Amino acid sequence: MKIALFGGSFDPPHNGHNSVVLEALEKLDIDKLIIMPTYINPFKQSFSADEKQRFLWVKKLWGHLPKVEICDFETKQKRPVPSIESVKYLYKLYNPSKFYLLIGADHLEKLHLWHDFEKLNSLVEFVIANRNDIEIPKNFKDLKTDKKIASSFIRNTLNTNEVCEEIKDEVKKYYEKLQKN
């Protein structure tokens, strides 16, 4: 079995994430795409939307797609989970012949700082979701995406133009409520 893991904060999920999901399904030779929202990113202090809400949004957006599985492994841990831990968990579950790890190009600069990076690098093939035509190292796969949007922009401005249509209204209401509190 060939699998790909796309983990992320999804705070909120948006058209950029959707572009990565659709491109991965189309361009990668995989049997399963596992989308795994984080409880909290090991490099961040907090999130705006709680893990349950982000998981529900992700499930609503992509849970119905063929070959897609939404996995709650990290959200159930109630702590920051390094990617290597999630990868090892999925190896035990699926014993894949090929394992792709999808990350945004914005993570390339600090990738060497990830927990147990050398081991992680030996277990997966990195696929870089490249939205800014950044030069990708030769040993990584380049997955071109056409959306240049950041979740922080949506949270800060409440501009939901780039939020996936299926959750646009609830995302706007959710972040408006957070800003009022």
UniProtKB/Swiss-Prot annotation:
GO terms for molecular function: ATP binding; nicotinate-nucleotide adenylyltransferase activity. InterPro entries: Cyt_trans-like, NadD/NMNAT, Rossmann-like_a/b/a_fold. Its EC number is 2.7.7.18. The keyword Transferase applies. CDD domains: NMNAT. Keywords: ATP-binding, NAD, Nucleotide-binding, Nucleotidyltransferase, Pyridine nucleotide biosynthesis, Transferase. It catalyses: nicotinate beta-D-ribonucleotide + ATP + H(+) = deamido-NAD(+) + diphosphate. Pathway: Cofactor biosynthesis; NAD(+) biosynthesis; deamido-NAD(+) from nicotinate D-ribonucleotide: step 1/1. The keyword Nucleotide-binding applies. It is an enzyme of class 2 (transferase). GO terms for biological process: NAD biosynthetic process. Belongs to the NadD family. Catalyzes the reversible adenylation of nicotinate mononucleotide (NaMN) to nicotinic acid adenine dinucleotide (NaAD). NCBIfam families: cyt_tran_rel, nicotinate (nicotinamide) nucleotide adenylyltransferase. This is Probable nicotinate-nucleotide adenylyltransferase.
